[in-house]
Amino acid sequence: MRIEKCYFCSAPVYPGHGMMFVRNDCKVFRFCRSKCHKNFKKKRNPRKTRWTKAFRKSAGKELTVDNSLEFEKRRNTPVKYNRELWSKTVEAMRKVESIKHKRQARFIMNRLKKGKELEKAADISEVKKNIHLIKAPHAGQAKQLEDKMVQKLAEDVEMDE
């Protein structure tokens, strides 16, 4: 069973699903749903349509250059069935999938880190600009007055003695 990719949005197209458009030069376009087919007929660019995989990769929102993505390449060479090879392949697929998930999570966190730093810098600058709203102008004077009173009392006690 071969799972194809949608030409427009890169979603998986399972056998018996979706539509196929074959151009005069025998180029085959597969679509997962009518939404993708309609956008293709309207000559929309998948890299400019915000909900497609192509947009997410071109905008730097998804991992594009990674060794774990090499395993998904299409291979047209038939291989004779071998139970041992099959079990090793399935195990390798599980490992690759777990590695890919970890790398994607790390990529997303690194991408979000920049925004958090910018947000923190903006918050700090806003606090610096509006510090008068946070700290009242006479906030420290009560403590100073109290210290002065203690000093005066200490001086008065010394003078009396």
From Swiss-Prot:
Pfam families: Ribosomal_L24e
GO cellular component terms listed in the entry, alphabetical order: nucleolus
Any one GO molecular function term: structural constituent of ribosome
SUPFAM superfamilies the UniProt entry points to: Glucocorticoid receptor-like (DNA-binding domain) (SSF57716)
Coiled-coil portions: none
Superkingdom to which the source organism belongs: Eukaryota
Swiss-Prot/TrEMBL GO biological process terms: ribosomal large subunit biogenesis
Keywords, ordered alphabetically: Nucleus, Ribosome biogenesis
InterPro entries: L24e/L24_sf, Ribosomal_eL24, Ribosomal_eL24-rel_N, Ribosomal_eL24_CS, TRASH_dom
Major localisation: nucleus
Complex formation: Associated with nucleolar and cytoplasmic pre-60S particles. At the end of biogenesis it dissociates from cytoplasmic pre-60S particles and is likely to be exchanged for its ribosomal homolog, RPL24.
Role summary: Involved in the biogenesis of the 60S ribosomal subunit. Ensures the docking of GTPBP4/NOG1 to pre-60S particles.
Protein name: Probable ribosome biogenesis protein RLP24
